[in-house]
Amino acid sequence: MLKPFVSITKPGIIFGNLISVAGGFFLASQGSVDGGLFLATVIGIALVIASGCVFNNYIDRDIDRLMERTQGRVTVQGLIPPGVTLAYGGVLGVAGFSVLWFGTNALATAFALLGFVVYVGLYSLYLKRHSIYGTLVGSLSGAAPPVVGYCAVSGQFDLGALTLLLIFCLWQMPHSYAIAIFRFHDYRAASIPVLPVERGVRAAKHHIFWYILAFLGATLMLTLGGYAGYGYFAVAAAMGLYWLVMALRGYRAGDDQVWAKKVFIFSIFTITALSIMMSIDFQVTETEVLMTSLR
């Protein structure tokens, strides 16, 4: 009875995002962790992400029927009525934003709202189906959680928060393009205009390489900017360089789908490792404020 209501929130996506939230939170905490604030941040953003996933499942129920990997989803199988799905998503969203508003600060809540609006309002409702740039715009929603975690502590949008936003936006691109390559036939069957389908797999390989290169540079900026230590720097450099080598191997890959799946899997290891390292290898620093919380 309850299983469909859990499944529709995409627990795996929530868990993955909470790792990045924790990374941003502990990076900003600089060793002085407020347990209550951490709990409010994690619960609030988890509920917001769950809400976004529920709405995404509702919106995508027609194209999910056409894709092999999504044909078993709750909304496709009719396990939860559409009206109940919408109400459920709404309740989760209100609960999540309320927890963030009362438990953290306005700036953290604003970035959570930005991510939600981009994911549900821009990406899911329109860009995913109509534009090759859907992945690019959607990357902003995937980059919001670590910034929420960071701003929940700092109450300000500084260069550290900006660097996190850049890192996670850049990471989303090769991660998503790799999915689109090894699930190429699904995306083509559903007429979703992702880059590999619209411009070809080789063009996507070019983009994957350059985005990983940019991602590598962005990750190192956390140390060069004085926010993370050299342990983080070493891990970021090693993971980024190996991911870059994997991208180069794609030009000689005998099976693009096998290669892309490896790139995708390693992307998860990479971002998880960086989130953990920034949590434990932080630097205490004075930062230049770009934006402060309203309260």
From Swiss-Prot:
Sorted alphabetically, the keyword list is: Cell inner membrane, Cell membrane, Heme biosynthesis, Membrane, Transferase, Transmembrane, Transmembrane helix
Stated membrane topology is: Multi-pass membrane protein
Q: Which InterPro entries match?
A: Protohaem_IX_farnesylTrfase, UbiA_prenyltransferase, UbiA_prenylTrfase_CS, UbiA_sf
Please classify the protein's predominant subcellular localization into one broad category. Answer: membrane
Gene Ontology terms: biological process: heme O biosynthetic process
Which EC number(s) are documented for this chain?
A: 2.5.1.141
Q: Which PROSITE patterns match?
A: UBIA
Enzyme class, top EC level, equals transferase
Molecular function (GO) terms for this protein are: protoheme IX farnesyltransferase activity
Transferase listed as a keyword? yes
Q: In which pathway does it act?
A: Porphyrin-containing compound metabolism; heme O biosynthesis; heme O from protoheme: step 1/1
Q: Which reaction does it catalyse?
A: heme b + (2E,6E)-farnesyl diphosphate + H2O = Fe(II)-heme o + diphosphate
* Presence of keyword Plastid: no
Cellular compartments annotated: Cell inner membrane
Show the GO cellular component annotation of the record.
plasma membrane
Which residues are listed as membrane-spanning?
Answer: 8-28, 35-55, 83-103, 107-127, 132-152, 162-182, 208-228, 229-249, 263-283
The record ties this protein, via CDD domains, to: PT_UbiA_Cox10
The record's annotation in NCBIfam families points to: cyoE_ctaB, PRK04375.1-1
Described function = Converts heme B (protoheme IX) to heme O by substitution of the vinyl group on carbon 2 of heme B porphyrin ring with a hydroxyethyl farnesyl side group.
Which family is it part of?
A: Belongs to the UbiA prenyltransferase family. Protoheme IX farnesyltransferase subfamily.
Q: What else is known?
A: Carbon 2 of the heme B porphyrin ring is defined according to the Fischer nomenclature.
Provide the protein name: Protoheme IX farnesyltransferase
**Protein's organism:** Chromohalobacter salexigens (strain ATCC BAA-138 / DSM 3043 / CIP 106854 / NCIMB 13768 / 1H11)
Q: What is the lineage of its organism?
A: Bacteria, Pseudomonadati, Pseudomonadota, Gammaproteobacteria, Oceanospirillales
